[in-house]
C-alpha cells in the first residue's frame, strides 16, 4: 500500500524526523490560505500523487508570492501529471502539499528496503540526492552506500555515523543525521513498511538535516495491525481493477500487454508471464486466484480481465494441488458462459483430477484451446492473440 508525501511526513514527525512545515490542500483557495498561515516569502507547491518524478513532470513549483502560489496551485490541481513512473496515461492531481521554502546547501538520498538476500532491512544512502537518483544508481552505483541492519541491535550509532560521513554530511551535523536515520529505521520497522525513501534529504544553510520529501510503501498483508495507516489509503490513486479484485481475494496487477493470465500461485503466475514473453507475447496482467478458487472467483477474474479492451486472448494455467482441476474446469466453463467470452481461451491444467478436468472442457461445447504443458500453452495463446 502506498501513501502520499504529506502523509509520509506525518509519520516521520512522530519519530522525531525534521520535515518542512506544510499543509495538504484540495483547492486553490486552500493553497493560498496555507501559504498565508505558513508565512515567509517562499513556498513550494507540490502535486500529491503516488509516483516519483513529479519535479521533472512539472508537478513541483517554487512560489515567491501569494499570487504565484495561486497560479501554480491552479495550474497543478486537475492536471494530468505524466512522469517516468506513471506511464504515458499519467495521474490526475487532486491534492497538493503547500510547504515553506527551504535553504538548500546540499541534497542527499537515504532509503530503506527489505533485502531478501540478507534477510535484513537495507539502508541505502548517497551524496547524489535529488531528482536524478535513478541515473546515479544506473551509472555510478559506487556512489550509493549500504548497510544491512541487524534486527536485534537496530541501526547502531557507528553505522549511522559512518554512512553520514560517506555521503558528505558536515561533521557538525553528524548527530542530527544519526538521529534522522535511526528515526527513519524505527518508523520503517514499526509501521511494517516495505520501502521508505527520502529524496532529497537536505543539509540547510545553517546545517540542519531536513527530510524534504518522503515516500513510503507498506506491506498490505500487515495493514490489519495499522488501522491508522489503512485510513491513509487513497483509492483514487489505485487501479480500479486491482481494487475490484481485492474484494474477491484475487491478487491482480495490471500490465501493458494483450494476453490475459489466470493462474493459481504467485510463482506459477510469474513463470507463466515469463514463458509468454519467451514466445513473443506480452501479458496484460498478473492474476493469482490462490489455492481456493471457486466458480464465483474464477468468474469475477474473467470479468476483471475482460474490462481491459486491449486483451486479445486469455491463458488459464492451473496446477491442481489443493485446487482440483475438475473444479477449475467447471469454473472456467461457467465463467466463459456468464461473461459471453469473445476472445480465444487457452487452458493448460495439470495435477489432481487432471484427466477429469480435460474431459469436462472437451465436452463443454465451448471453443476452448487446450494445451499439455506451459510451452505449448504459451505458443498457442501468443498465436491466438496474433490472430493466427
From Swiss-Prot:
Reactions this protein catalyses: succinate + ATP + CoA = succinyl-CoA + ADP + phosphate; GTP + succinate + CoA = succinyl-CoA + GDP + phosphate
Domain named ATP-grasp is located at: 9-244
The keyword Ligase is annotated on this UniProt entry: yes
Keyword annotations for this protein, in alphabetical order, are:
ATP-binding, Ligase, Magnesium, Metal-binding, Nucleotide-binding, Tricarboxylic acid cycle
Pathway assigned in UniProt = Carbohydrate metabolism; tricarboxylic acid cycle; succinate from succinyl-CoA (ligase route): step 1/1
For the ligand (Mg(2+)), the binding residues are 199, 213
Enzyme Commission number(s) of this protein: 6.2.1.5
Q: What InterPro entries is this protein classified in?
A: ATP-grasp (IPR011761), ATP-grasp_succ-CoA_synth-type (IPR013650), ATP_grasp_subdomain_1 (IPR013815), Succ-CoA_synthase_bsu_CS (IPR017866), SUCC_ACL_C (IPR005811), Succ_CoA_ligase-like_bsu (IPR005809), Succinyl-CoA_synth-like (IPR016102)
The GO annotation for biological process reads: succinyl-CoA metabolic process; tricarboxylic acid cycle
User: What enzyme category does the UniProt record give?
Assistant: ligase
Relate the assembly described in the record: Heterotetramer of two alpha and two beta subunits.
Family annotation (NCBIfam families): PRK00696.1, sucCoAbeta
Q: What name goes with this protein?
A: Succinate--CoA ligase [ADP-forming] subunit beta
Encoding gene, per UniProt annotation: sucC
Amino acid at each position: 500500500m502506498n501513501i502520499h508525501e504529506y502523509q509520509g511526513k506525518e509519520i516521520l514527525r512522530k519519530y522525531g524526523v525534521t520535515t518542512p512545515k506544510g499543509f495538504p490542500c484540495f483547492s486553490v483557495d486552500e493553497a493560498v490560505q496555507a501559504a498565508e498561515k505558513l508565512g515567509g516569502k517562499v513556498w513550494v507547491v507540490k502535486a500529491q500523487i503516488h509516483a516519483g518524478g513529479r519535479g521533472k513532470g512539472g508537478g513541483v513549483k517554487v512560489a515567491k508570492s501569494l499570487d504565484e502560489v495561486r497560479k501554480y496551485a491552479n495550474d497543478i490541481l486537475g492536471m494530468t501529471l505524466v512522469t517516468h513512473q506513471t506511464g504515458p496515461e499519467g495521474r490526475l492531481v487532486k491534492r497538493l502539499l503547500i510547504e515553506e521554502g527551504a535553504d538548500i546547501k546540499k541534497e542527499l538520498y537515504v532509503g530503506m528496503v527489505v533485502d531478501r538476500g540478507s534477510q535484513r532491512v537495507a539502508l541505502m544512502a548517497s551524496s547524489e540526492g535529488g531528482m536524478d537518483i535513478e541515473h546515479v544508481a544506473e551509472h555510478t552505483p559506487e556512489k550509493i552506500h549500504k548497510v544491512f541492519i541487524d534486527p536485534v541491535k537496530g541501526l547502531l550509532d557507528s553505522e549511522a555515523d559512518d554512512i553520514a560521513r560517506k555521503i558528505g554530511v558536515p561533521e557538525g551535523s553528524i548527530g542530527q543525521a544519526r538521529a534522522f536515520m535511526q528515526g527513519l529505521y524505527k518508523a520503517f520497522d514499526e509501521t511494517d513498511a516495505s520501502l521508505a525513501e527520502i529524496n532529497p534529504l537536505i543539509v540547510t544553510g545553517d546545517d540542519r538535516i531536513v527530510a524534504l520529501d518522503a515516500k513510503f510503501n507498506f506491506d498490505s498483508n500487515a495493514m490489519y495491525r495499522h488501522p491508522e495507516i489503512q485510513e491513509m489509503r487513497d483509492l483514487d490513486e489505485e487501479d480500479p481493477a486491482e481494487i475490484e479484485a481485492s474484494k474477491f481475494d484475487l491478487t491482480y496487477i495490471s500490465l501493458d500487454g494483450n494476453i490475459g493470465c489466470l493462474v493459481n500461485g504467485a510463482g506459477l503466475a510469474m513463470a507463466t508471464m515469463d514463458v509468454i514473453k519467451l514466445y513473443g507475447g506480452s501479458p496484460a496482467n498478473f492474476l493469482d486466484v490462490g489455492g481456493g478458487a471457486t466458480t464465483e472467483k474464477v468468474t469475477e477474474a474473467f470479468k476483471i480481465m475482460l474490462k481491459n479492451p486491449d486483451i486479445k486472448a486469455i491463458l488459464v494455467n492451473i496446477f491442481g494441488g489443493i485446487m482440483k482441476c475438475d473444479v477449475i474446469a467447471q469454473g472456467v466453463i461457467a465463467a466463459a458462459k456468464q461473461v459471453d467470452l469473445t476472445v480465444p481461451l487457452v487452458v493448460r491444467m495439470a495435477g489432481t483430477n487432471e484427466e477429469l478436468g480435460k474431459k469436462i472442457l472437451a465436452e463443454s461445447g465451448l471453443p476452448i484451446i487446450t494445451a499439455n504443458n506451459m510451452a505449448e500453452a504459451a505458443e498457442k495463446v501468443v498465436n491466438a492473440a496474433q490472430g493466427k
